[in-house]
A protein has these predicted regions:
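Anion-binding alpha/beta catalytic cores of soluble intermediary-metabolism enzymes, centered on
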Residues: 1-268, 273-334
């Protein structure tokens, strides 16, 4: 087992958090629930009719002993929850009736509301729905955390090259949410990614590099200007981590290249958090690292929300779900 994921599971066990899984029609969710409960990683809440879910589980040989159930159809607080959702979306024209219909019909919204109310500690979804559906529920119900306007994502990349990053571990961001971030959004993404590095990846000293095809003025362009503006924004935001840019990838992570291209940088040559200028480069970058370097990729991990919600790939395995639940439990302490 990977050392980092093992550490996350052990940390989650000590926290005893409750994580809600709304997509109970997926048998992988049921199998993961059994495994998580048996291993003591977290308490699990499921959305739906308890009898029906347990019957589905029994058909595949799964016990849900110890699971908690929340059924929208019999929820005594559904009206209060609906009123709260209406208030959060009132400026967008949402009525009480519409809010209640959404909570009754979409388990992701219902689960997100339980997270927002603090009745559970976090949500994991996406095994049977697109990322956009999970994000929509999280943003509409929970919203960005104080001080941020941007909800984005990151990947924790665990490589076999300990000479780079933090003993081979990196955080890549954003590789899953914002197609063409503004300079302000890039600054938000950097703040969230640095937090992800500390709490999830175990990187004690995040060193954040804003990546580009240019290093310190070696070239110009619209995307380069955006990165430079993000750096200036971050300088006045009183952050507690080192950052620099614009840097080419080799200047960011290779000490010899950094010495030649950015000799006065506190980050160049030792970056462990990589901020990509757009979603194209971020998504391509993590997949290149995953496939060609045979790195383990944890994510996409949603960041910037007031309370933790994480998305699953629709191709996820049971073990993937277990790992993301552990991450969500740990991040509920952020």
């Amino acid at each position: 087992m990977n050392t980092l994921t093992n550490k996350l599971k052990e940390k989650a066990k000590k926290l005893n958090k409750t994580i809600i899984l709304p997509e109970t029609e997926d048998e992988r969710i049921l199998r993961a629930t059994e495994k998580i409960i048996n291993e003591g990683i977290a308490k699990i809440a499921l959305v739906g009719n308890e009898k029906e879910i347990k019957e589905r589980a029994a058909k595949i040989g799964v016990s849900l002993e110890g699971a908690i159930f929340y059924n929208p159809d019999s929820c005594a607080t559904i009206d209060a929850m609906s009123e709260l959702l209406k208030k959060r979306r009132e400026k967008k024209g949402m009525t009480f009736e519409t809010a209640k219909a959404i909570l009754m019909s979409d388990p992701r919204y219902f689960a997100a509301m339980l997270v927002h109310q603090g009745r559970v500690d976090g949500m994991v979804a996406g095994s049977s729905s697109p990322t956009a559906h999970v994000l929509r529920a999280a943003i509409h119900v929970i919203g960005p955390r104080q001080g941020l306007k941007t909800v984005s994502s990151s990947f924790v990349m665990i490589t076999n090259t300990p000479e780079f990053g933090d003993n081979g571990t990196f955080v890549y961001s954003d590789g899953g949410v914002i197609p063409d971030p503004t300079a302000m959004q890039l600054a938000d993404i950097a703040i969230s990614a640095a937090e992800k590095a500390r709490f999830t990846a175990g990187i004690k000293e995040p060193k954040v590099a804003f990546l580009s095809f240019s290093t310190k003025g070696s070239a110009d362009g619209v995307s380069v200007s955006k990165v430079r503006e993000a750096i200036e924004i971050l300088k006045v935001r009183n952050v507690d981590f080192d950052f620099d840019g614009e840097l080419q990838l080799d200047a960011a992570i290779v000490p010899e290249v950094a010495a030649a291209k950015a000799p006065n940088s506190k980050v160049a040559g030792q970056a462990n958090v990589l901020i990509f200028p757009d979603l194209d480069s971020g998504n391509i970058g993590y997949k290149l690292t995953q496939r060609l370097a045979k790195a383990k990729a944890l994510g996409p991990l949603i960041q910037g929300l007031a309370r933790p919600v994480h998305d699953l790939s629709r191709g996820c395995s049971v073990e993937d779900i277990v790992e993301v639940v552990a991450i969500t439990a740990v991040e509920s302490e952020m």
